[in-house]
Amino acid sequence: MTTVNTDKRILIMAGGTGGHVFPALAVAKYLCQQGWQVRWLGTAERMEARLVPQHGFDIDFIDIKGVRGNGLLRKLAAPFKVIRSIMQAQAVIKEFKPDVVLGMGGFASGPGGVAARLSGLPLVLHEQNAIPGMTNKILARIASQVLCAFEDTFDNVEAEVVGNPIREELIALGDSNVDPVTDDALKVLVVGGSLGAKVFNDLMPSVTAAVSKTHSITVWHQVGKGNLQGVKAEYQHLGQDGSVNVAEFIDDMEAAYRWADVVLCRSGALTVSEVAAVGLPSLLVPYPHAVDDHQTKNAQVLVQAGGAFLLPQTILDANKLIGKLQILASDRNELAQMGLRAKSAAVLDATQKVASVCIRLAGKD
């Protein structure tokens, strides 16, 4: 068991979505292994409130929500809420006395980052997406060090490209995931996020039925909360229930990636980084309502490497999906080459790079 050194303390701010929380957890676990004491700053209503304690880390909460909105009362109240949340973050910092603060996105990062600088602490920012969120755009002006996953993420701010931290088990999977090309059924992993992706749920039953007429295909489809029965019934109606595993959630993504030949998914930053790390080809459908369309830019890294196909949702239909899957089912050599090209775009030491910057700025190297 790692001995925690109470003279090495870091406050990590990340929350709201898995794209923020899981990379931060990777860094937290690495630093914990190096003897650091880790404390988390988040919000009580978002996923970090459940996930962070499950992974063994203490978490403090501040009261802050998104400030984008058009209501007059919302706009008038926003400055007072932000000031209150900064004061709450300052209280956490005063009690915990961290040596460095790491912000990785989410509502708590804004007030926490300001509180860190007001307290005279080094602030490290990490932006996971190819286009930064509003909070990181603002904090980048006052941060001690800005890190990012992709080239040309920030305008007029010097940032070091380090990649996205991902779980160690997925990096290990990528090292062993180079399987020989086989003539077995094409294994398609469909991942739509915690709420599922309606476009995948609507199209994949008929797509699977069409592809199965010419090629052997099996599907593992994560449909999201509340969608299980409807999607499962549609697969059954089309006679595909025997070749499909339909689930609301996939708890073990390592097992899912190990099983898959190709992934149909959104192009959130974490998903893109994980697919690259495990060396899987992908069909990327960016979420069309993402802020600043950042998912399309995220996808370009794998598309330009030749490891993925980009399928904008505005032009996506069953025929396009059928065509892509038939091509991949027919040419297993190309499927394998796409996986290798995806792997070539992966950054596998991002966790260590982020941690080393935090250690250096804390003066603990």
UniProtKB/Swiss-Prot annotation:
Pathway noted in the entry: Cell wall biogenesis; peptidoglycan biosynthesis
Subcellular localization: Cell inner membrane
Cellular component per GO, a single term: plasma membrane
Keyword Magnesium in record: no
GO biological process, alphabetically ordered: carbohydrate metabolic process; cell division; cell wall organization; lipid glycosylation; peptidoglycan biosynthetic process; regulation of cell shape
One Pfam family in the UniProt entry: Glyco_transf_28
EC annotation from Swiss-Prot or TrEMBL: 2.4.1.227
Matches recorded under InterPro entries: GlcNAc_MurG (IPR006009), Glyco_trans_28_C (IPR007235), GlycoTrans_28_N (IPR004276)
Entry GO MF terms: UDP-N-acetyl-D-glucosamine:N-acetylmuramoyl-L-alanyl-D-glutamyl-meso-2,6-diaminopimelyl-D-alanyl-D-alanine-diphosphoundecaprenol 4-beta-N-acetylglucosaminlytransferase activity; undecaprenyldiphospho-muramoylpentapeptide beta-N-acetylglucosaminyltransferase activity
Free-text function comment from the UniProt entry: Cell wall formation. Catalyzes the transfer of a GlcNAc subunit on undecaprenyl-pyrophosphoryl-MurNAc-pentapeptide (lipid intermediate I) to form undecaprenyl-pyrophosphoryl-MurNAc-(pentapeptide)GlcNAc (lipid intermediate II).
Family statement drawn from the similarity comment of this UniProt entry: Belongs to the glycosyltransferase 28 family. MurG subfamily.
Entry protein name: UDP-N-acetylglucosamine--N-acetylmuramyl-(pentapeptide) pyrophosphoryl-undecaprenol N-acetylglucosamine transferase
Organism: Shewanella sediminis (strain HAW-EB3)
Top-level taxonomy: Bacteria, Pseudomonadati, Pseudomonadota, Gammaproteobacteria, Alteromonadales
